[in-house]
């Protein structure tokens, strides 16, 4: 498990302009991949690509709720690099916490459109490309601890991550015959753009998550999630598919047991 674990691989990372996606872009290119960063945040995405090096990373602006834009992002990648080996479907949104009695259904629809429909569109078009080229690819989706249990996250976000995990498992069944693996990576609370807006809120999120965590002495960072995604993207996990790899310090297991 040393050396260039993605040497020569072509990777799309959605939500790659910040947080877990940006960490994954840096890590994957360190391991020999060429990465296309897909995001709506154009300035941030371009800056990440430039910081990595434009010989290894490029940016493509895409609204993942628009299937035509998703298809074009995959086409751009294949035209630029000749193939697609890995999709890290990481883009997501999260609404504020609130009572189910006051559920904002417009916000619910937006969350589902990004977190589920957008992921489904990318899985569809990435898999089509892999099948057409005979690539035994890997698809990794950022799910969440909230895909396993209710309670920690907002209602719409929790529902979307449960749905996404179902999609991962269903796609695993449909794509296995082509040699394509599909897995989820499920973090506990991480201080990223979804949860934090400045240094003060980063500390608040990390303090809260550390206080409620099962595993003490470690603060979960975006890099830890990127490490898990690297494992699932690489041939180190060559016979792993349909799994939801928890990066939660045992939170989901212990909470399920205690409940």
Curated annotation (Swiss-Prot):
Q: Which residues take part in binding substrate?
A: 144
EC number, UniProt record: 1.1.1.-
Q: Keyword Chaperone, does the record have it?
A: no
Q: Which UniProt keywords apply?
A: Oxidoreductase
- Domain of life per record: Eukaryota
Which PANTHER family does the record cross-reference, listed alphabetically?
A: SHORT-CHAIN DEHYDROGENASE REDUCTASE, SHORT-CHAIN DEHYDROGENASE REDUCTASE 3A-RELATED
Protein name, as recorded? Short-chain dehydrogenase reductase 5
Which organism is this entry from? Arabidopsis thaliana
Which gene codes for it?
A: SDR5
